[in-house]
């Protein structure tokens, strides 16, 4: 966890990068599911950093509840963002306090983290597909060591 988060204070982002910022810093950091229709098409596809593949608002909202329930004070640090055409990718640091069993590891109450590499594919101003590759093995190791 030594890499600093991007300081986006006062930075004007492209509309797509701004949507990614809103996704992580407003939707995820505050578990604000009311933002889901603002960010995504109704039948968007999502593959989360912890493994599940989901479609649509309802399934994704359940994933938000599950992750933020499993990790107290869940937060994402945006470490990098790269934009090419209708795609935004990046490097993220996901972290929180381990408070529910996950991958067979009992809750420790300790602060744990894992990195993720998202690829957001936009169709117009909204996200059509989001694929996030997560370092699950690193997370499991940190949960076990906690």
Language-model regions, residue ranges each:
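C-terminal and inter-domain tail/linker signature
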Residues: 1-146
């Amino acid at each position: 966890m030594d890499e600093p988060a991007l300081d986006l204070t006062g930075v004007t982002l492209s509309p797509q990068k701004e949507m990614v910022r809103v996704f992580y810093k407003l939707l995820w950091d505050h578990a604000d599911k009311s933002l889901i229709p603002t960010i995504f098409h109704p039948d968007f596809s999502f593959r989360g950093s912890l493994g599940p593949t989901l479609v649509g608002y309802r399934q994704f909202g359940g994933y938000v509840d599950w992750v933020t329930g499993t990790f107290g004070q869940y937060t994402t640090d945006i470490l990098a963002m790269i934009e090419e055409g209708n795609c935004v990718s990046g490097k993220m640091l996901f972290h929180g306090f381990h408070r529910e069993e996950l991958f067979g590891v009992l809750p420790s109450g300790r602060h744990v983290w894992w990195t993720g590499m998202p690829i957001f594919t936009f169709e117009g101003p909204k996200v059509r597909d989001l694929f996030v590759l997560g370092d699950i093995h690193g997370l499991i190791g940190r949960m076990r060591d906690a």
